[in-house]
Swiss-Prot record:
Source taxonomy: Bacteria, Pseudomonadati, Pseudomonadota, Gammaproteobacteria, Vibrionales
Subcellular location(s) per record: Cytoplasm
Protein name, per record: Sigma factor-binding protein Crl
Gene Ontology biological process terms from the UniProt entry: positive regulation of DNA-templated transcription
Its biological purpose: Binds to the sigma-S subunit of RNA polymerase, activating expression of sigma-S-regulated genes. Stimulates RNA polymerase holoenzyme formation and may bind to several other sigma factors, such as sigma-70 and sigma-32.
Region annotation (Essential for activity) ranges: 99-122
Keyword ATP-binding attributed: no
UniProt keyword Protease, yes or no: no
Keywords: Activator, Cytoplasm, Transcription, Transcription regulation
NCBIfam families, A to Z: PRK10984.1
Length: 133
């Protein structure tokens, strides 16, 4: 017996994923793929707000046949609004990891419990699998 995976409609997913926190970038998301990021740690608070850069993470959630898969990276969010992949400085690592871990708990609960769908790391993931620690 086969069962089809039933996904909530795209608009409902956007609303629910937005409610998880201030992370969903609607303009960079599309049907079946959702882009999240977090500006976790300011590099220089002495600069004017529009010139500030941050250390943080971004995560892409992609629909699969049975749920979703994710991949994420760490880096610097520059003053132009671009992510630049890179190694986090030691003094910023804890703050950045905490925000990612906190978000992943909320994301997992939503996908697995509320939607009754699967959530797995992408085969393309270069970082550690989330929730495995």
């Amino acid at each position: 017996m086969t069962t089809d995976t039933i996904f909530p409609p795209h608009g409902r997913l956007m609303t629910k994923l937005t409610a998880l926190g201030p992370y969903l970038r609607k303009q960079q998301s599309k049907e079946g793929e959702f882009f999240f990021d977090c500006l976790a740690s300011c590099i220089s608070a002495n600069k004017s707000p529009e010139e500030r850069e941050f250390w943080g993470w971004w995560l892409v959630l992609t629909a699969t046949d049975i749920g979703f898969e994710y991949r994420y990276d760490f880096g610097r969010y520059d003053a132009k609004g671009n992510w630049i992949k890179g190694t986090l400085p030691a003094k910023h690592t804890e703050a950045v990891l905490k925000t990612l871990d906190d978000f992943y708990v909320k994301l997992t609960k939503f996908v697995k419990e509320d939607c009754q769908l699967d959530l797995q790391a992408s085969a393309e993931l270069e970082e550690a699998v989330l929730g495995s620690a």
